[in-house]
Amino acid sequence: MLFRSSAGNPGAPAAAGGRGNNVNNRRYGGDIQGVREELPYLRSLGVTCLYLNPVFKSPSLHKYDTTDYRHVDDNFGYAGDLAELTGETEDPATWKWSKSDKLMLDFVAEAHRQGFKVVLDGVFNHAGSQFGPFLDVRQNAKNSKFADWFNISNWDPVTWISFGGRAGGNMPELKKDPVTGLAPGPRDYVLNITKRWLAPGGDASRGVDGFRLDYAQNVPRVFWVTYRKFVKSVKPDAYIAGEIWTPATSYLAGDAWDATMQYPFANAVQAFFIGGSQKPITATVFAERLRQFNIIYPFQVSLDQMNLLDSHDTDRWASRFVNANHPAPEDPNPTGRGGRRPYNTSKPTELEWQRMEQSIAVQMTYVGAPMVYYGDEVGMWGATDPDDRQPMIWKDLAPYDDPEVTFNQELFDRYVRLIAIHHRFAALQTGFAHTLLADDARNLLAYSRDLGDAHIYVAINKSETAQSVDLTIGPPDKDYAMIDWLDPAQAVVQNAAAKTPDERPQIQAVSRVKPAVTAHKGKATISLKPWGAMILAPASAH
């Protein structure tokens, strides 16, 4: 969320202050230039793709109530720049580029130069109440040329259906059509907006690299089939990810989306490592849930899935370990509104940080594309909106007013290491997954990622005692020496301060390192620390 990132442009509006601004609406001055200036930080973390929450013109903090899809919000760029534009209509031939738009395109160019892809939030199910076509409908009712753009339930007075099926409200839904998905007017507008940002001026190299589609299951599937064909004709390698909180097999058959924000993955990881309204699931159940993700979708889709643990719509991942017994389906709001049990927003303990790190090892090594919500890597915690959308913790802004708020260097280093491991091994990016062990009595889990003759072994001890486990791994006819890539004594992260514009941290085995584990003719004994994890592969492996 740009408002909560970093401020870099003195021409952008200042952050609001004072008691009159409640926490849901308060801005903190983050802007495009600020994110651009932090690209080296994101490189040092190992990130290769940036998904930005909505950047288009909108009156709100969250920007999911779009006023103008053609233009970047001037809060993120240059205040008042849209006033300089005149004569624009819904016709793309009339569209111009504001100074804030150009700043965004410059940002995309710089991000590309530094090795990043950029994915924007596409809010195409609904618009905002200040959206030009909707204002015209409010004024002219059924005589408006945009009368067929929205779900109007009554014309006198004008009454509409908003986001979530609510009557009225400030996010009017775009009209759906059983044949085309969206009514012709908004359908063409959405396609033209998509092309504008994918290929500015017809040049796909200057555009963004894809869209995350907000509340996408509420738009009929037939539209997404059209959308995919259109997007791939403009930019064949563009990424299309739908927001849906349940399995999405019908959308991931190769003719609609490339992937989803895979909330079922987050739910499975939480159910095993934390629990919720019920006690944690067993290792066997967890392994089967993970396996099912690779069965219900084509494997290429599974590789592309956004494997998140939390997001702007959930509580922070770290805080779930603090609230291990909090009912998962309930709103984890710190006030306990509606009679619900209050959420504990205390800072996680050392043990809770350790358990969080263990879960991240699974996120970074299982099938899919790991997605990190900003600030998780430095130890941000909190309940749901607005607590999960606090400003980013930056080292150069320390010390903070709250002495408990600090940049968690140990956690950051663990993220860097795990991401570097993910980048080093092709098997972790495109390899198949196989369960090696699921010991329910001892809370042990082990699996492999396999690509041809390359194998990466992951072992998890989800218990408070050290344990040893026998595994069948490695070739059956010879010894097979492996190091633990999670152990800083066995593998070091290099080039964290990138020397070239597109470089990322790399991990290398320590010279002449002794193996952590040696398999003898396919058999090995692995010793795991309490709440420990190991990632095993030969020292020379890639």
Give residue ranges: language-model regions:
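Outer-membrane beta-barrel transmembrane strands
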Residues: 98-99, 356-358
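Active-site clefts of carbohydrate-active enzymes
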Residues: 304-349
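Active-site rim elements
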Residues: 22-28, 94, 175-182, 212-215, ...
